[in-house]
């Protein structure tokens, strides 16, 4: 029997003590520049709380992540010379990783001055079930729904 891989524990971030925020900072980070990524995320959180009359930015962030995270996705499997898109349930760790990735990508594609402003705008849109990252989640769910007939091929 194979032994399960043990993952390195990530402590919470230093402002909120939240592991999810620490993982999000790591997802935003480019070229190992963690201080820059931390500043971007915390600036985005301060912009969110300013625009929402002092409402807790962490709650808006959590709501946005839960709105973006996909429940099902399609995976390719080759069966008898044909490749099928098989709908599969997404593990919780992958759900959050996909949410972080989509949030970063679609915030970067937005127009705006700084990455912090773009990230804040995308987070607020996602919390309200709008924005490009929520569209991406809906698109993934539609693909899974369209290929429901191949669910019996699960691996």
Curated annotation (Swiss-Prot):
<dbReference type="GO" id="GO:0003735">
    <property type="term" value="F:structural constituent of ribosome"/>
</dbReference>
<protein>
    <recommendedName>
        <fullName>Small ribosomal subunit protein uS7</fullName>
    </recommendedName>
</protein>
<keyword id="KW-0699">rRNA-binding</keyword>
<dbReference type="GO" id="GO:0000049">
    <property type="term" value="F:tRNA binding"/>
</dbReference>
<keyword id="KW-0820">tRNA-binding</keyword>
<keyword id="KW-0689">Ribosomal protein</keyword>
<dbReference type="InterPro" id="IPR023798">
    <property type="entry name" value="Ribosomal_uS7_dom"/>
</dbReference>
<dbReference type="GO" id="GO:0019843">
    <property type="term" value="F:rRNA binding"/>
</dbReference>
<dbReference type="InterPro" id="IPR000235">
    <property type="entry name" value="Ribosomal_uS7"/>
</dbReference>
<comment type="function">
    <text>One of the primary rRNA binding proteins, it binds directly to 16S rRNA where it nucleates assembly of the head domain of the 30S subunit. Is located at the subunit interface close to the decoding center, probably blocks exit of the E-site tRNA.</text>
</comment>
<comment type="subunit">
    <text>Part of the 30S ribosomal subunit. Contacts proteins S9 and S11.</text>
</comment>
<dbReference type="GO" id="GO:0006412">
    <property type="term" value="P:translation"/>
</dbReference>
<dbReference type="InterPro" id="IPR005717">
    <property type="entry name" value="Ribosomal_uS7_bac/org-type"/>
</dbReference>
<dbReference type="GO" id="GO:0015935">
    <property type="term" value="C:small ribosomal subunit"/>
</dbReference>
<keyword id="KW-0687">Ribonucleoprotein</keyword>
<dbReference type="InterPro" id="IPR036823">
    <property type="entry name" value="Ribosomal_uS7_dom_sf"/>
</dbReference>
<keyword id="KW-0694">RNA-binding</keyword>
<dbReference type="Pfam" id="PF00177">
    <property type="entry name" value="Ribosomal_S7"/>
</dbReference>
<comment type="similarity">
    <text>Belongs to the universal ribosomal protein uS7 family.</text>
</comment>
